[in-house]
Amino acid sequence: MEKIIVRGGNKLHGSVKVEGAKNAVLPVIAASILAERGASIIEEVPSLTDVYTMKEVLANLNVGVEYENGRFAVRADRPLKTEAPFEYVRKMRASFLVMGPLLARVGRARIALPGGCAIGSRPIEQHLKGFEAMGATVEIGNGFIEARIDGKLQGTKIYLDFPSVGATENIMMAAVLAEGTTIIENVAEEPEIVDLANYLNAMGAKVRGAGTGVIRIDGVDALQGAVHSVIPDRIEAGTFMVAAAITGGNVFVEGAIAEHMRPLVAKMREMGVDIIEEEAGLRVIGPEQLKAVDIKTMPHPGFPTDMQAQMMALLLRAEGTSVVTETVFENRFMHVEEFRRMNGNIKIEGRSAIVSGPTSLQGAEVGATDLRAGAALVLAGLVADGYTRVTELKHLDRGYVNLTEKLKALGADIERVEEHQENESLEAAELI
């Protein structure tokens, strides 16, 4: 079993390049199924376990896939299989995103009930509601969801009860080949939605309104392969921004797009962090003393839930009391117990966490309960007294490429080791 060992105390300096966005690339890969002719070339694809899982899902559907050096090539101009089995889908909820494209392209999809991070209920009813509104028959049983349509899906008006990112993406992909016009209201407005719409339009789709609360899609007869470069990962960028701020460092985050991160930039500036917007990215300079702020996660353009845990690590170092309210997922405070193991002073009251700081964090052995919690614990380790050991790295590898190496290049005292190598690593560190 691997673990990350961090010794706190070093300020981070230098430059770090952000990878392509995990939450953008997965739906884009799924959308490639829609192309009846030609190859799709997707660039800036991060080397993540979720990407490899999606590659396996597509290969199992008889889609031709190649992935090398950040470039993903897809050919779906062949007879497609229609079942995504549990062995793949259980690893990652985003596998469910192939349902919309399969339903639109071949009229049938049988997908195992999805897996992924255990951070509360993320119901798929919104996806299915959209498919049914477009004329599909949906059945759930024996661990599978099966959707069928005789003929083509029909354009219609769909209202989402909640602006779910996954439901917005899945319904968008189904609607591009539907007969007539589909209008989706109360949709997600994330930058990743805009990125998917740009890719679909490059394939020949007619999608308008992405990035607003209403998306209008005029169905077309067929799509073809296209070339697309994935947007930078705003959550990875945000994680490195917090790393710079929490250590009092000075880091240039190459590829960070301020327009995609306005809530985070605003809150960090409110805490006293100096953030300079440059043409190629953002420079982040941490202050001597951070100020407490309140944070409430919301669908975009509100504060992103995927940055809640990392910001909580930063708030532990701030002067005063901060309140973090989680409104998107009902079970996303599992990292609080791990912070407490590091001497974090946090109380839970319903959907809010009350953070009292500044806390003198202490190194401890902690577990990554989910993807973003893992990153947050590494961030806390950067300023903790002594050694912090972060385990359960399988979650971390789903969303970060070479996190340890990138932090080390910025000056962090950090190693990723096998359990049997830990003593050797610590002994070597003591000699330096």
UniProtKB/Swiss-Prot annotation:
Name which cysteines form disulfide bonds: none
Q: In which pathway does it act?
A: Cell wall biogenesis; peptidoglycan biosynthesis
Return the SUPFAM superfamilies for the record: EPT/RTPC-like (SSF55205)
Q: Which reaction does it catalyse?
A: phosphoenolpyruvate + UDP-N-acetyl-alpha-D-glucosamine = UDP-N-acetyl-3-O-(1-carboxyvinyl)-alpha-D-glucosamine + phosphate
Residues involved in UDP-N-acetyl-alpha-D-glucosamine binding = R93, R122, P123, I124, E125, Q126, D306, V328
List the GO terms this entry assigns under cellular component, sorted alphabetically: cytoplasm
Q: Which residues carry this modification: 2-(S-cysteinyl)pyruvic acid O-phosphothioketal?
A: C117
Which residues of this protein are catalytic? C117
In which residues is phosphoenolpyruvate bound? Answer: K22, N23
Pfam family of this protein, just one?
EPSP_synthase
The reply on keyword Cell cycle is yes
Which EC numbers does the record give?
A: 2.5.1.7
Function, as annotated: Cell wall formation. Adds enolpyruvyl to UDP-N-acetylglucosamine.
Q: Which family does it belong to?
A: Belongs to the EPSP synthase family. MurA subfamily.
What is the protein's given name? UDP-N-acetylglucosamine 1-carboxyvinyltransferase 1
